[in-house]
């Protein structure tokens, strides 16, 4: 799927959401934010909803379990490195991994690499197998 975070590497914006006044999500707070929850994001015409299963499995909700054409499926793995301001979430879709800092801008989130926004305005929905609004 073209919308997965690993394929979203072109810079979406400048430095605005990868520094203050946004707050970097670090250490255990990063694991708490993602584990057992769904990240909802969009860029251009692509939209995705990735479920961060406890234990590290990463699922794309797509159109849900009941959809015969585009059901939810595992797309890779995720993990968190808790290291203060060097804390990152790493995604592996089977073709190599990508690591991102996550910045909280008041309830929407930016996924950043080297201070550059790759995905912005992402939201987190509580739970898995719930889809995004």
Give the ranges of each region predicted by the language model.
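Bacterial N-terminal signal peptides
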Residues: 2-10
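Lipid interaction determinants
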Residues: 13-75, 81-133
């Amino acid at each position: 799927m073209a919308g997965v975070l690993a394929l979203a590497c072109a810079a979406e914006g400048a430095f605005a959401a990868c520094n203050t006044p946004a707050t970097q999500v670090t250490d255990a707070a990063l694991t708490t934010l993602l584990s057992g929850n769904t990240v909802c994001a969009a860029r251009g015409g692509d939209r995705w909803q990735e479920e961060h299963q406890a234990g590290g499995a990463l699922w794309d909700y797509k159109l849900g379990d009941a959809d015969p054409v585009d059901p939810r499926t595992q797309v890779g793995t995720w993990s968190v490195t808790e290291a203060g301001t060097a804390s990152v979430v790493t995604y592996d879709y089977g073709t190599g991994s990508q690591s991102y800092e996550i910045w909280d801008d008041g309830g929407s989130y930016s996924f950043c690499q080297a201070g550059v926004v790759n995905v912005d305005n992402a939201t987190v929905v509580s739970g898995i197998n719930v889809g995004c609004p």
